[in-house]
Amino acid sequence: MAKKSLIQREKKRHKLEQKYHLIRRSSKKKIRSKVSPLSLSEKTKMQEKLQSLPRNSAPTRLHRRCFLTGRPRANYRDFGLSGHILREMVYACLLPGATRSSW
């Protein structure tokens, strides 16, 4: 089980990312625009605007966690579970459609 403080920190990052998502996306779109290219000074202003946003609002700062244990490693996207919890649940027949492989 992960520490509660780490799980709360991750939730806080997720909220910040959602809050600043549109601002971040629109400013990046303006910087990269080929249709109406910006001058160098305008690009630097947009870059400064991006840098002024909180660090934890960047999507790369997020980490996918197991929703039962909070474990940050070995997560399966399809189930939202870490590997060892997924294995235990499959063996206990708690996940429909998932079976042990045998050949």
Curated annotation (Swiss-Prot):
Q: Kindly list the organism's lineage.
A: Eukaryota, Viridiplantae, Streptophyta, Embryophyta, Tracheophyta
InterPro entries reported for this sequence: Ribosomal_uS14, Ribosomal_uS14_bac/plastid, Ribosomal_uS14_CS
How does the record describe its quaternary structure? Part of the 30S ribosomal subunit.
Cell compartment(s), UniProt: Plastid, Chloroplast
UniProt GO BP: translation
Q: GO molecular function terms here?
A: rRNA binding; structural constituent of ribosome
Tell me the superkingdom of the source: Eukaryota
**Family annotation (Pfam families):** Ribosomal_S14
PROSITE patterns on file: RIBOSOMAL_S14 (PS00527)
Q: What does this protein do?
A: Binds 16S rRNA, required for the assembly of 30S particles.
Q: Which gene encodes it?
A: rps14
Asked if the record carries the keyword Zinc, the reply is no
Write down what this protein is called.
Small ribosomal subunit protein uS14c
| Annotated family | Belongs to the universal ribosomal protein uS14 family.
Q: Please tell me the species this chain comes from.
A: Sorghum bicolor
Gene3D superfamilies named in the record: 1.10.287.1480
This protein's UniProt keywords: Chloroplast, Plastid, Ribonucleoprotein, Ribosomal protein, RNA-binding, rRNA-binding
Tell me which GO cellular component terms the UniProt record holds: chloroplast; small ribosomal subunit
